Amino acid sequence: AAPLGVKSLVVDSAADACAGQVAPLVVADWTDYAALEKFAAQVDVVTFDFENVPAETAHWLAERVAVFPAPQALAVAQDRLAEKTLFRECGLSTPDFMTVDTREQLDQALARVGAPAILKTRRLGYDGKGQFRLRAVADADAAWAALGAQAPAHGLILEAFVPFERELSVLAVRGRDGDFRTWPLTRNWHVDGVLSM
């Protein structure tokens, strides 16, 4: 933002947040509404750079200042089930998937989705975290042992495994005036399911 002449102010709960190296940093918890009130009074627009900002906080901020993307988009991005459901509603292809809340539902999901498959937490998983790869149906006990305890808090989803050659990312933005822009595709390199570059 700085090279574009845009002044930034950053909120993070960590005093050593990396964004604090390039912009003034407000150290506050996402539910510290007194600090967030002061933050909102100093900015024209709020955005976020990862999806684990509580959606409730984004909604709260949106009542005080413009928030982009919209808090509703953040809420969808935080839940793999909501994402996949939205994609299908938009006519996009997704791997087969099924929610899993109990060990018995994992067996049912495997019967429907098949193996290989990936059991994932619906929330807060990234870079291979919150995931277990089932190479065969016989891996169900190990998968449940690894992630089952997270089912009550985060929910789980079983997704059919998709063999792929590479993962690509694109940065796309839409301005308030409707102008839509993209930047060139970049390739993501993974090692053991974790983004390394």
Residue ranges and their predicted role:
Residues 76-169, 173-197:
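Active-site nucleotide/adenylate-binding loops and adjacent lid/helix of ATP-dependent enzymes
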Residues 1-85, 89, 104:
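ATP-binding N-terminal substructure of ATP-dependent carboxylate-amine bond-forming enzymes
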